[in-house]
Structure formats: C-alpha cells, structure tokens
C-alpha cells in the first residue's frame, strides 16, 4: 500500500491522506470518499503510513502537469489562498493519441534590423520587458519568437488582457500558425471548452491566445509565455484568489525553463523598475512612419465646435475616428442642482448611473436598477441633471450633430456576448462604421488602417482620482488611445483636459513619464513598497468595524519587522449592503508581508476577511 496526501477540489477541507496500490501519483486527479460523498481531488505528494486507518482513492485518467502543481502551491502561499480553491482553477491534462498534423511552416514577415536586434536581446534573458512604442512592430517580434518556440517542439502561450483583443490578434496569428492556434477566454461555452481541451491533449493546439485564465491550461512542454499589454489591470483577479497573471508568469520563468516576454507601449511602473537596468528592450518609433498632430482643448464641454469640425472632415475623407469616454451609460450620476445631492444606490455607497436606453438608473457595483426619479428625494426639486457624460450620451449627441454618420459603441453594455463583440469590431474593420465610441476597451491593441482621429474625453476624471496610480493610469491611457490613430495614415489626436501643462510634458516619450513618476511616487507605495490589503465586511456597520479592530489588535502581535499597519473605513464604504473596513499592510520586503498575514490567519481563523496581496488599487 502507498499513502498519498490529497487536496479535495472545490472544498475548503485541508489536504487528507488516502491509500492506493500505486505510487508516483503526484498531480493525478483522483476520486475520494468524503462524508458520504465522492469528491475529486489532486494528489500533492506521497507520505508515510499514518497512525490512523485510511480510505482508498480511485485514479482517473487526468492529471496536473508539474508546472501547474508548483504554480498552485505558490499561489496558495503568496496570495494566502485556500489550496483546494486554487487547484480548482487549473484544467488537467489527459494522455491521448497525438494528431498526425502536417507540419506547418509559418510564413512570417521579415523583421527590420531593429526588430531582429530586439528579438536577439529578448532571447538572452529568461524574463524580459519589450518596451515598444505603439505601431513599432511588437506583434511581429512576438510571432517570430513563437515560431522559434514551436520549431523546438514546445508550446507557447500569448496572454492578452481582455477578450476584446483576441479576435483581431487571432486573425493575424491564424494566417501564420493555422491549426496550431487555439483561443481561450471565459465567454467560451462548455462544449467549446471541451473541444479546445481535446485538441490541446492531442497537441493539435500548440499556441494558445487567451485571457488570464489561459495560464491555468495544461500546456505540455511550455516554452514561451508572452504577456501583451502587461501594464493592464485586467491581469489582476479581483476575486479570491486575487492573483496577478503577469507576476505568476515571472515566477514560472524563475522556476522552469520557460521564457517570459512582457510587452507594452506603456509598461507599468513596477515592471519598468524591475527590468530597466537588466532586461529591458526598447523599441522606439513606428514600423510605418506617419505624421500625428496632437491638439489639446482646455474645456469641460464635450462636443466642441473644433472637435465637431474634425469629425466631419474624417467622414468626408472616408476615414475613421475613435472616441474614448471613461464611463459607460449616458451619465455617471444624476444630480440635483438645487441641493447638490446625487442619486445613490440603496445597497452601495456609490452613485447610480443613468441608462436612457433601458430608462433606468443602474448601480455598476451590485447591478441594482430602479426607475429614473422625477423629483429629488432630498429637497423635492423637479430638476435633475446628468453629470459625467458616458458613451451612450456621446452617441446621442453625435447622432443629432452628424446626420448620416455610422456610429457604434464598444463597452461592457454592448459586448455581452462574443458575437456582439466580433460584429462591432468586424464592422469597424470593414469600414461599415465611421466612428467608434468606447471605454477603456477601445485602447487595447486594436490596429485599424483608416483611423485618422483619436479623441480623449474625460481623462481628468482618471488623473484626478484618489488612487496612487491615477497619473500612471491616465497617461498610459492617453498613449494607448493616441496610438490607435495614424498607424498607416497621418492623423490627429484630440485631448480634452484642464491639465494640459502637465500632460504635454510626457507625450513625446513615455519613458520620460516613467522616470518622472519614479521620482514622484511616494516611498509608501509600489514599486518602492509592497502592499497587502485585508477587507472586513458585515451587514452591520458596527460589526464590520469591530472585526477590523479585533484583527488590528491580533495583527499587531503578528507583524514581522518592517511591516506597518493602518486601519480605515473603505473609500467605498458599502457594496451590496455590506459595510467595509480595510487594513493596509506595507513593507519593503514581500516575504515579511506574507509571514505576517499567515501568522494572523493562523492565530485568528474565526475573523473572516479577504486577502489582496499587491492590490492595484485601494477602494
């Protein structure tokens, strides 16, 4: 008999010991009896015979690959997450007959000398940062790196931050890698996922393009991971376990012979700081040089005469425009001009957004909706006005000003299914649409030859927010959106902001901004300090506060040297009827943070809290 430690899946029970007639089962998925049920579990390791009687496990044909087991254990430890819950993220492998596909010889565009030099430099390092201006040809470098990996009979993974990036990226890669390419994201149906995995098992799929969950796929002989748009916050999960896929890739490059390339035109400050002195490859300028004119307007009006004239010229020349708006819906909030009270969600301490299409107010946190009120609840005034314009309101105003213009919206409300997303992007690519209005989705890597005008509205709402990353997020967005214009033809960028003096300093070279921000960023925040955020919530505000106070007292006894603690009410104090209090831990040493949190969780297991290591924001 052989004894094995098993982590039950989708169950918070700690690992348990079972016996088997087989050994060397590490990573195997097995059926185990537990409390009159049969559960699926993962074998973690072989152990000595225990002093108590054990039940027998039943082996299945599925198993996790060694890198998956290693990664799962790291996630559980680093992010203070339940190991069984973490293991449930991973898709297992199954041995099967290999598909005898005809060998694909990729037909690639020749790289320029600059691109060739960049690729050679990237391949000198297990992990590196490709800092390439928009339009500089990063994707061509990616494809050559992937082709070389497949030639070595290894598999490759290309991570993209959002599903909105994948259709266009897929088309470019499909022409080159044909049947070796597979697409993975959360909107796939269960049947589509099953078909995908069967092709992965047979190694028909050797290159996966996917969002962050693709990192948990069983890619055999994984040799290369590319993280495109590495700066994007979408790589950070906001649900437990709150992992950052980009950072996990860097961990894999450290533990396994897997090359990792991070790519961005606007790299995150943390990545720039990490790589700037050792493995940063700078790719300046455009692959196809074009002229771009940047125009600032100091105004709080949205559709100004100057902007309207520019849009008319775009339509007259049969070209295209994109317009960035940070808010979906018609307006971010409904305000009473008499008493200055806004309409708030009854379950969250946030304003409700105005959606005229459905004639409702909606909370974008808990999704509560209600009819649009006719009077102010606070002072009974019959006048309510919308504030902070959204995508739908921009569409409404432009349709009245640009008769006959074909305008579409790219935001969460309009891309609820993959088909809707594809239709919007394909119509714009086929020039069936003149103007595309969108939220941050519009900034993410789209490449359209006929876009000659990029418009940035409402950027002040981002750069003036309370986040310590506010300026970084705002300037990065400016660069990304400006990069959608004049990729193959000359064009213009309209930026409406009252902070033109500040922003004008950084529009020549994003590296100028990174160096400025490194000097300005307080020592209390990343990349100079590491953060861990603990959240305590309860339907009763006093109990939520009491939980955080009890936790603070316990934590103060558990803190490692160099770790500081602050306790405060969350900036958004209520979400979905639960009041929220936060504890923020800081340290220059991440290991000290992890040890402090582990000690607290062990000392106070009955104090419920969520742990967010390396939070991208504090809200």
Curated annotation (Swiss-Prot):
Catalysed reaction equations from the record: Couples ATP hydrolysis with the unwinding of duplex DNA by translocating in the 3'-5' direction; ATP + H2O = ADP + phosphate + H(+)
PROSITE patterns: HELICASE_ATP_BIND_1, HELICASE_CTER
Assigned GO CC terms: primosome complex
Record's keyword annotation contains Plastid: no
Positions occupied by motif DEAH box: 228-231
Keyword match Metal-binding: yes
GO terms, molecular function: 3'-5' DNA helicase activity; ATP binding; ATP hydrolysis activity; DNA binding; zinc ion binding
Note accompanying the cofactor annotation: Binds 2 zinc ions per subunit.
Residue positions binding ATP: 132-139
Protein name in the entry: Replication restart protein PriA
Organism listed in the record: Helicobacter pylori (strain J99 / ATCC 700824)
Gene that encodes the chain: priA
């Amino acid at each position: 008999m052989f004894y094995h430690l098993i982590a039950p899946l989708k169950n918070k029970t700690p690992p348990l010991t079972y016996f088997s007639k087989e050994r060397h089962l590490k990573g195997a998925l097995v059926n185990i009896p537990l409390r009159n049920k049969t559960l699926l579990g993962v074998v973690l390791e072989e152990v000595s015979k225990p002093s108590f009687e054990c039940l027998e496990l039943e082996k299945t044909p599925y198993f996790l690959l060694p890198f998956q087991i290693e990664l799962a254990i790291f996630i559980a430890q680093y992010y203070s997450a339940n190991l069984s819950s973490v293991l449930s993220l991973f898709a297992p492998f199954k041995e099967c007959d290999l598909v005898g596909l005809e060998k694909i010889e990729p037909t690639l565009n020749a790289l320029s000398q600059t691109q060739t030099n960049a690729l050679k430099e990237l391949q000198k390092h297990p992990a590196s940062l490709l800092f390439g201006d928009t339009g500089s040809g990063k994707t061509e470098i990616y494809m050559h790196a992937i082709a070389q990996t497949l030639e070595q009979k290894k598999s490759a993974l290309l991570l993209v931050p959002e599903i909105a990036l994948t259709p266009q990226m897929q088309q470019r890669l499909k022409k080159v890698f044909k049947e070796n390419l597979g697409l993975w994201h959360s909107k796939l149906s269960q049947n589509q996922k099953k078909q995908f995995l069967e092709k992965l098992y047979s190694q028909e799929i050797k290159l996966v393009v996917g969002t962050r969950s693709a990192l948990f796929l069983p890619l055999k002989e994984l040799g290369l991971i590319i993280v495109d748009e590495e700066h994007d916050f979408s790589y950070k999960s906001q649900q437990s376990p709150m992992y950052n896929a980009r950072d996990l890739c860097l961990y894999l490059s450290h533990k396994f012979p897997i090359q990792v390339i991070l790519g961005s035109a606007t790299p995150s400050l943390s990545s720039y700081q990490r790589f700037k002195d050792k493995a940063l490859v700078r790719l300046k300028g455009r692959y196809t040089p074009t002229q771009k004119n940047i125009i600032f307007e100091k105004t709080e009006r949205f559709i100004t005469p100057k902007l309207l004239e520019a849009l008319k010229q775009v339509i007259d020349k049969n070209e295209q425009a994109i317009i960035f708006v940070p808010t979906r819906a018609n307006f971010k909030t409904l305000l009473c001009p008499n008493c200055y009270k806004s309409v708030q969600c009854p379950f969250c301490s946030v304003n409700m957004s105005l959606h005229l299409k459905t004639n409702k107010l909606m909370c974008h946190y808990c999704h509560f909706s209600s009819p649009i009120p006719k009077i102010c609840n606070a002072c009974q005034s019959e006048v309510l006005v919308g504030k902070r314009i959204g995508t739908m309101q921009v569409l409404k105003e432009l349709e009245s000003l640009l008769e006959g213009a074909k305008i579409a919206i790219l935001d969460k409300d309009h891309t609820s299914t993959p088909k809707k997303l594809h239709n919007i992007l394909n119509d714009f690519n086929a020039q069936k649409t003149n103007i595309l209005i969108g939220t941050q989705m519009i900034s993410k890597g789209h490449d359209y030859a006929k876009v000659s005008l990029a418009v940035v509205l409402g950027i002040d709402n981002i750069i003036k927010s309370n986040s310590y990353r506010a300026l970084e997020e705002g300037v990065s967005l400016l660069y990304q959106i400006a990069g959608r214009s004049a990729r193959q033809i000359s064009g213009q960028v309209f930026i409406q902001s009252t902070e033109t003096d500040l922003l004008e300093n950084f529009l020549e070279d994003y590296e100028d901004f990174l160096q400025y921000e490194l000097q300005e960023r307080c020592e209390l925040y990343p990349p100079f300090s590491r953060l861990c955020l603990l959240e305590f919530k309860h339907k009763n505000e006093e109990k939520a506060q009491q939980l955080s106070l009890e936790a603070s007292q316990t934590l103060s006894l558990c803190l490692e040297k160099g770790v500081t603690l602050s306790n405060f009410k969350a900036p958004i104090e209520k979400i979905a009827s639960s009041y929220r209090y936060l504890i923020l831990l800081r340290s220059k040493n991440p290991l000290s943070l992890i040890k402090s949190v582990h000690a607290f969780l062990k000392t106070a297991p009955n104090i419920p809290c969520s742990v967010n290591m390396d939070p991208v924001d504090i809200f």
